[in-house]
Amino acid sequence: LPPVPGGKPLTRPWIVVERQGRKIGIVGLVNEETPSLASPCKEAVFGPAETALREAVASLRAQGVNIVIALTHLGLNVDCELAGRVDGVDVFVGGHTHSLLSNTNPKAVGPYPIVKHSPSGEPVLVVTAASSCKLLGHIAIDFNDAGIAQRWNGEPIVLDGRNVTVPPDAKLSARLD
């Protein structure tokens, strides 16, 4: 979200975390239809995701970040399109279309992950894990020193309740059903 006129941004557009001595940027993106799908505050302004992503990647790279993850609510097709159009993003973790990606589930719409290539030819991994907290996305990625994914392995984990130790919240369960 861009700043309100004369003000500060309503949210942080990205964060930088450090893991194993590496700076990792995580960028949040939602679709421009959010105001008609949700009830954001009236000050919120939603712009083009691609523009926001390009600006975020440039800023993150200037801060020495060489692994960028886009956490999106744009839909699988948009994530895949952006993966092929925007340099500097390594992984898209997406939602919105409730698409199932899997290497083992015959109902999947594609493999987990989908591998696209950035304009500069680097691999970009796209993952999503359906909807309603029925699956938990899981992927392990080996990056080289330049932050380029070299190897990866993953598969969504079915959350079937077999090891549940906390009773379900009735109100939340009703909303998910």
Spell out what each predicted region is.
Residues L1-P167, K171:
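Acidic, metal/ion-coordinating pockets
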